[in-house]
Curated annotation (Swiss-Prot):
The modification N6-succinyllysine is found at K468, K542. The active site is at H615, D619. Residues 90-166, 217-293 form the Lipoyl-binding domain. It comes from the Eukaryota. The lineage of its organism: Eukaryota, Metazoa, Chordata, Craniata, Vertebrata. The modification N6-acetyllysine is found at K461. This is Dihydrolipoyllysine-residue acetyltransferase component of pyruvate dehydrogenase complex, mitochondrial. The modification Phosphoserine is found at S99. Its main location: mitochondrion. Keywords: Acetylation, Acyltransferase, Carbohydrate metabolism, Glucose metabolism, Lipoyl, Mitochondrion, Phosphoprotein, Repeat, Transferase, Transit peptide, Tricarboxylic acid cycle. Delipoylated at Lys-131 and Lys-258 by SIRT4, delipoylation decreases the PHD complex activity. GO terms for biological process: glucose metabolic process; pyruvate catabolic process; pyruvate decarboxylation to acetyl-CoA; tricarboxylic acid cycle. The gene is Dlat. GO terms for cellular component: acetyltransferase complex; mitochondrial matrix; mitochondrion; myelin sheath; pyruvate dehydrogenase complex.
C-alpha cells in the first residue's frame, strides 16, 4: 500500500554487507511463545493471528467482508502457531521480511548443514530478496536440526518456516524425518476450541476487534523504512482527517533511525482516522498509523475507532523539572536478598533470551547473578527489569558511620534534557558496536598537496560558472583509485567470509543538525572530478535538509571523514561496519621541506591523514601499501589519468 517517497530509489537496503538477524518461534514442552517478525508486523503466538498486523500488509480488514488473496496472508491465517508436544524443545525459524517491499525470497545458499553447531553471529544462509542477496545470521547458540527449504528454492513466502534449530545436540536425531505436516498432526486437538470468545465478556468493537463492524477500509501500519529500523517517530501529518488522497500524495513524514522519509499514497481514498498523533516517538514497526476508506460517506463510521494496540502511544512530553530538595534526612533502604544464580548449562553456559542478554549488557548486569524465571530457568526480560544487585558486606558497616555532607542536586533551570532522536540512538549503538567488536589500528602519513592545489586552480578556471572542484573531491578520487590498487581495503568482514568489493562506493561523512550521516558517491573509481564534485554538493545539501533517500546513504565500501576545514590537524576515526577502513583527513599547513635549490629548502602545503583499519581484514603492511598508493595519486595527480 505504501512506499518510500523516492520512486527512482535503486534499493531500500544496502547492496552489500547487510545482515538480517532471524527471529525464531520457540516451540516444544514449556517453551515460551515469542513474537517472530514477519514483514512490518509482529505475529503474536499467544493470540494466534494478529487482529491487524498481517491483514494490513495487504490493505485488507476483517470488516470488509472480503477474502485475503495474498498467498502469505492465506498461509498465516490458515496456519496458527501450534506446539509440538511430541518433540524436544526447538525453534521454528521463519523467513523474515528483509526489505520493506519483500513478499518472497530465494534461498541462495545454506551456510550451515544439518547437525552443525551454530554460534551467536554465525551466518546461517544467504537469501535473495527483491533488492539484494542478504546474509541471515543467528542471535544465539544452537544446533541445526532440520533444513525444511533446500538451496535454490525460489519464491519462498515471507513467514514460511525454513529450518528447525535445537539447543542440545542430542535432540537433533528427533527431527530426522520432521516435516511441517507432521508437526501439525502432532498438535493438540483442543487448541482450536479456544477460538470462540465467551459470551459473558463482550468487548467494544473499537477496542478488542477493530474492523469487525466497520465499512470496508484499509488499516495502514508502520513499515520498515530502513534495514536497521525498529521504531519511528511521526514527525508530521501532511493530510487531515476527511481529506481526499490521490496517488502520489505525501501522507506523513516519518523519522527513522537514518533520516526523515516522506510516506506517500499509492491508491486513491479518504483519510478516515489518524491513530498516531504528530510527535509520537518510538512507534514500533507494525503499529497502525491511520485508517483509509474508499468512499467519503464511510469516514464518519471511524470517528471512535481505537485499536487497543495504539492506546499507549502518546506524544512524548517534555522531561519534568527536578522536584524540590527536601530537608528530611534519607531513610536507609532495605537490602534486597541476594538472588540465586541462574542455572548453568553445559560448560557453565547461562540460558538467556537475546533481548534479556542485550538489556543486561546495556545495564552492566552479571547474568550469573540473575535468577531466571522462564522455562527451564531461562533468563527473560522480566528478570533483568526486576534484578536488584546484591550489596557488599562492607556497605552495612559504612551505614553505621555518621552521614557525610550531602551534595545538593542542581536546581531546576540550570540544565536542559535533550530527547534522544532515533538517528542519535542508532549512531550511538553502531559506534559502540564498532569499538567493541572491531580491532582498530591506525596508520598516519603526511601528503604534499602542492601539485593538487595547482591542478585544482587550473581546473576551476576552466569550470568558471559551472561549479568548483574542492580538495575533498581529489581525496575521494584518489581513495577510490587506491582501493582498486589495494582491494583488501575495499572489503567487508562477513563473519564467515571476507567480501572483497569490485566497485568503490565512497561514503562521505556529513554533519547535520540531526547527527552524522554518510551519503555515498557510487562508483567513485570511474567518475571524473567534476561529477564527484556535483554529487558531493547535492548529497551534502540533501543530508542537511533531511531529504536523503535510503539508497543514498545505505551501503558504501569505504568511508572518508574530513575535519580539516575546522582546523583539526589529525584525528582517528571510528570504522563504519561492515566496512574495513575509514580515512580521517586533517588540515593542510605550510611546512619547510628539503629541496634541491639555492636555499636548500622549500615551503609546502602538507596534509596529515590517518587510516583506521579492521585488523581482521587489513593487515598492517596492506594498510601501509594503501596509504602509499593514496599519497602517490595526490602528490602526482596526473597519475589519476592512467
Amino acid at each position: 500500500m505504501w512506499r518510500v517517497c523516492a520512486r527512482r530509489a535503486r534499493s531500500a537496503v544496502p547492496r552489500d554487507g547487510f545482515r538480517a538477524r532471524w527471529a525464531a518461534l520457540k516451540e516444544g514442552p514449556g517453551a515460551p511463545c515469542g513474537s517472530p517478525r514477519i514483514g512490518p508486523a509482529a505475529v503474536r503466538c499467544g493470540s494466534g493471528i494478529p487482529r491487524y498486523g498481517v491483514r494490513s500488509l495487504c490493505g485488507w480488514s476483517s470488516g470488509s467482508g472480503t477474502v485475503p488473496r495474498n498467498r502469505l496472508l492465506r498461509q498465516l491465517l490458515g496456519s496458527p502457531s501450534r506446539r509440538s508436544y511430541s518433540l524436544p524443545p526447538h525453534q521454528k525459524v521463519p523467513l523474515p521480511s528483509l526489505s520493506p517491499t519483500m513478499q518472497a525470497g530465494t534461498i541462495a545458499r545454506w551456510e550451515k548443514k544439518e547437525g552443525e553447531k551454530i554460534s551467536e553471529g554465525d551466518l546461517i544462509a544467504e537469501v535473495e530478496t527483491d533488492k539484494a542477496t542478504v546474509g541471515f545470521e543467528s542471535l544465539e547458540e544452537c544446533y541445526m536440526a532440520k533444513i525444511l527449504v533446500p538451496e535454490g528454492t525460489r519464491d519462498v513466502p515471507v513467514g514460511s518456516i525454513i529450518c528447525i534449530t535445537v539447543e542440545k545436540p542430542q535432540d537433533i536425531e528427533a527431527f530426522k524425518n520432521y516435516t511441517l505436516d507432521l508437526a501439525a498432526a502432532a498438535a493438540p486437538q483442543a487448541a482450536p476450541a479456544a477460538a470462540p470468545a465467551p459470551a459473558a465478556a463482550p468487548a467494544a468493537p473499537s477496542a478488542s476487534a477493530p474492523g469487525s463492524s466497520y465499512p470496508t477500509h484499509m488499516q495502514i501500519v508502520l513499515p520498515a523504512l530502513s534495514p536497521t529500523m525498529t521504531m519511528g517517530t511521526v514527525q508530521r501529518w501532511e493530510k487531515k482527517v476527511g481529506e481526499k488522497l490521490s496517488e502520489g500524495d505525501l501522507l506523513a513524514e516519518i523519522e527513522t533511525d537514518k533520516a526523515t522519509i516522506g510516506f506517500e499514497v499509492q491508491e486513491e481514498g479518504y483519510l478516515a482516522k489518524i491513530l498516531v498523533p504528530e510527535g509520537t516517538r518510538d512507534v514500533p514497526l507494525g503499529a497502525p498509523l491511520c485508517i483509509i476508506v474508499e468512499k467519503q460517506e464511510d469516514i464518519a463510521a471511524f470517528a471512535d475507532y481505537r485499536p487497543t494496540e495504539v492506546t499507549s502511544l502518546k506524544p512524548q512530553a517534555a522531561p519534568p523539572a527536578p522536584p524540590p530538595v527536601a530537608a528530611v534526612p534519607p531513610t536507609p533502604q532495605p537490602v534486597a536478598p541476594t538472588p540465586s544464580a541462574a542455572p548453568a548449562g553445559p560448560k557453565g553456559r547461562v540460558f538467556v533470551s537475546p533481548l534479556a542478554k542485550k538489556l543486561a549488557a546495556e545495564k552492566g548486569i552479571d547474568l550469573t547473578q540473575v535468577k531466571g524465571t522462564g522455562p527451564e530457568g531461562r533468563i527473560i526480560k522480566k528478570d533483568i527489569d526486576s534484578f536488584v544487585p546484591s550489596k557488599a558486606a562492607p556497605a552495612a558497616a559504612a551505614a553505621m558511620a555518621p552521614p557525610g555532607p550531602r551534595v545538593a542536586p542542581a536546581p531546576a533551570g540550570v540544565f536542559t534534557d535533550i530527547p534522544i532522536s532515533n538517528i542519535r540512538r542508532v549512531i550511538a549503538q553502531r559506534l559502540m558496536q564498532s569499538k567493541q567488536t572491531i580491532p582498530h589500528y591506525y596508520l598516519s602519513v603526511d601528503v604534499n598537496m602542492g601539485e593538487v592545489l595547482l591542478v585544482r586552480k587550473e581546473l576551476n578556471k576552466m569550470l568558471e560558472g559551472k561549479g568548483k572542484i574542492s580538495v575533498n573531491d581529489f581525496i575521494i578520487k584518489a581513495s577510490a583509485l587506491a582501493c582498486l590498487k589495494v582491494p583488501e581495503a575495499n572489503s567487508s568482514w562477513m563473519d564467515t567470509v571476507i567480501r572483497q568489493n569490485h566497485v568503490v562506493d565512497v561514503s562521505v561523512a556529513v554533519s547535520t543538525p540531526a547527527g552524522l550521516i554518510t551519503p555515498i558517491v557510487f562508483n567513485a573509481h570511474i567518475k571524473g572530478l567534476e561529477t564527484i564534485a556535483s554529487d558531493v554538493v547535492s548529497l551534502a545539501s540533501k543530508a542537511r535538509e533531511g531529504k536523503l533517500q535510503p539508497h543514498e546513504f545505505q551501503g558504501g565500501t569505504f568511508t572518508i571523514s574530513n575535519l580539516g576545514m575546522f582546523g583539526i590537524k589529525n584525528f582517528s576515526a571510528i570504522i563504519n561496519p561492515p566496512q574495513a577502513c575509514i580515512l580521517a583527513i586533517g588540515a593542510s599547513e605550510d611546512k619547510l621541506i628539503p629541496a634541491d635549490n639555492e636555499k636548500g629548502f622549500d615551503v609546502a602545503s602538507v596534509m596529515s591523514v590517518t587510516l583506521s583499519c579492521d585488523h581482521r581484514v587489513v593487515d598492517g603492511a596492506v594498510g601501509a601499501q594503501w596509504l602509499a598508493e593514496f599519497k602517490k595519486y595526490l602528490e602526482k595527480p596526473i597519475t589519476m589519468l592512467l
